[in-house]
Amino acid sequence: KLVLGNYSTVRDYLDVDDFSRGLILTLDKGISGESYNLCSGIATEIRSMIELFKKSLKLESPVKFTENVSTDIDLPYQVGDNKKIYELCGWTPMIKLEDSIDRMVKEL
C-alpha cells in the first residue's frame, strides 16, 4: 500500500519531447532577453497523476492519501501560461500526459 500526503497540489506537466521541441523553436525564433513558458498550461492534481500511473502500470493496490499536509515551500497551484511562445512560433504541446506516462512505464 502506498501512502501519500498533499494529494490536492496542482501542477503543470510537460513531456520531454514537447519541451525539447519548444526549446529548439525558442532558441531559433525567440527574442534575446525575453522569457518564455514551455508548459502544457493544463492543471493536473497529484491524485490524478497517481491514478494515471496506476492505470499504466496495471496496479490494483490502493493508494492511501493522508490529510492534506504541505510544507512552507509547497505551492498549492502552479500552472504555466504558454500563450507567448504559441504566439511567437505556434508551439503547443502535442503529447498528452497519459501518453507520456505510458511511454515512461514501457521503458521500465
For each feature predicted by the language model, list its residue ranges.
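Amphipathic terminal alpha-helices
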Residues: 83, 97-108
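Short, flexible, glycine-rich and Lys/Arg-enriched loop motifs at helix boundaries
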Residues: 1-7
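Glycine/proline-rich active-site loop of Rossmann-fold NAD(P)-dependent oxidoreductases
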Residues: 2, 16-18, 25-37, 42-45, ...
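Residue-level signal for the nucleotide or nucleotide-sugar donor/cofactor binding architecture
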Residues: 8-17, 41-44, 73, 77-80, ...
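Generic structural signal for alpha-helix termini and adjacent loop/cap motifs
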Residues: 26-30, 88, 107
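C-terminal "lid/loop" region of Rossmann-like NAD(P)-dependent oxidoreductases
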Residues: 6, 35-36, 44-51, 58-77
